[in-house]
């Protein structure tokens, strides 16, 4: 799968933009704060419906405008396809595929698989569990439509159950209705746990080999799924925690409290690893993500690299560039020295200056 062109209208600092992309490496270079990351964000939003920054739709609309438009012309194999997305300040975003509106965002997932890698991805390793759950969910939602349904339903049930727990202080007679929500929480929660475990097991097998190469054979890595509650124990855990849930007015058991551990040579690197180990693990994770997508959907994803090379030493730069030379990639950077030094093929250059993009070859 490849993206052939991008069009933006009233998106962040872009009034209008049209870019024709190479199937290989597309490098967007220029000074900081010129709008390079905004282009990558637009691509990611159009493929996943979510900003990698966690931005709201209204935040991505150009100042003074009421809506923005993103259009991607893509190709899957020999089949062309167009995605149109309208972001609106006070309404739900509008999405169309080949001119036909879609009602559910989940219908868009997997049409174009994208992997986003930025310096902030180090947070997956070193920050709290919510960062790691978000990583799992964003990738699984692109790969597994059944997971999308299970996750959406689980989150809806969780929201309603927590709302009910807060109301019980005023209406204790509502407690019996918890049984209905508990049944659904367990049903969809089990599906979420099962899918996450399978995903982490597959990812873990791939990342081991990649990380050994990246570390020059010095490190072995394990990615361990750490569910709050095991799948077969979820029903009992929800039942057991009910009284405590009622006291704290929130749901204390379930996959919304899951985590992942990254263990290098027996050490949990989130707590005890050096920044170098954390960077290598983050890089291994993203390269493994690429290979897992290829394995599952039989095609490589589009790779979006946002100012990553400046954060890596020479050895890691070399490994990263060697691992992506066969994938359609969009890379942002301030200069071209790293590519020249690594003799990296630069298929198409774009110079970005204050919301204006000029193609140079």
Predicted regions and their residues:
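Walker B catalytic acidic pair
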Residues: 306-308
């Amino acid at each position: 799968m490849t993206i052939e062109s991008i069009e933006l209208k009233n998106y962040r600092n872009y009034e209008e933009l049209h870019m024709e992309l190479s199937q290989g490496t597309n490098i967007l270079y220029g000074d900081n704060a010129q709008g390079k990351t905004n282009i990558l964000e637009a691509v990611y939003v159009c493929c996943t419906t979510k900003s990698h920054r966690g931005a709201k739709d209204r935040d991505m609309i150009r100042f003074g405008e009421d809506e923005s438009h993103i259009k991607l012309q893509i190709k899957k194999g020999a089949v062309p396809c167009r995605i149109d997305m309208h972001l609106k300040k006070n309404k739900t975003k509008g999405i169309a595929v080949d001119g036909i509106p879609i009602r559910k965002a989940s219908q868009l997932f997997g049409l174009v698989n994208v992997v986003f890698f930025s310096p902030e991805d180090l947070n997956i390793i070193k920050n709290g569990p919510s960062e790691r759950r978000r990583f799992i969910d964003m990738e699984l939602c692109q790969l597994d439509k059944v997971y999308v349904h299970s996750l959406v339903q689980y989150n809806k049930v969780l929201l309603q159950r927590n709302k009910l727990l807060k109301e019980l202080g005023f209406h204790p007679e509502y407690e019996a209705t918890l049984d209905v929500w508990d049944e659904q929480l367990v049903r969809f929660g089990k599906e979420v746990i099962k899918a996450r475990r399978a995903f982490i097991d597959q990812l873990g097998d791939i990342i081991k080999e990649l990380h050994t190469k990246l570390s020059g054979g010095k490190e072995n890595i394990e990615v361990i799924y750490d569910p709050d509650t095991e799948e077969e124990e979820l029903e009992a855990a929800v039942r057991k925690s009910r009284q405590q849930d009622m006291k704290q007015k929130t749901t204390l058991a379930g996959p919304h409290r899951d985590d992942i551990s990254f263990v290098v040579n027996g050490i949990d690197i989130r707590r005890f690893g050096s920044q170098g180990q954390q960077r290598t693990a983050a890089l291994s994770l993203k390269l493994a993500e690429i290979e897992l997508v290829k394995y599952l959907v039989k095609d490589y994803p589009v790779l979006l690299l946002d100012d990553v090379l400046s954060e890596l030493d020479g050895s890691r730069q070399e490994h990263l560039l060697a691992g992506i030379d066969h994938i359609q990639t969009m890379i942002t950077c301030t200069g071209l020295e790293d590519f020249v030094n690594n003799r990296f093929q630069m298929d198409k250059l774009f110079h970005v200056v204050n919301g204006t993009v000029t193609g140079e070859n």
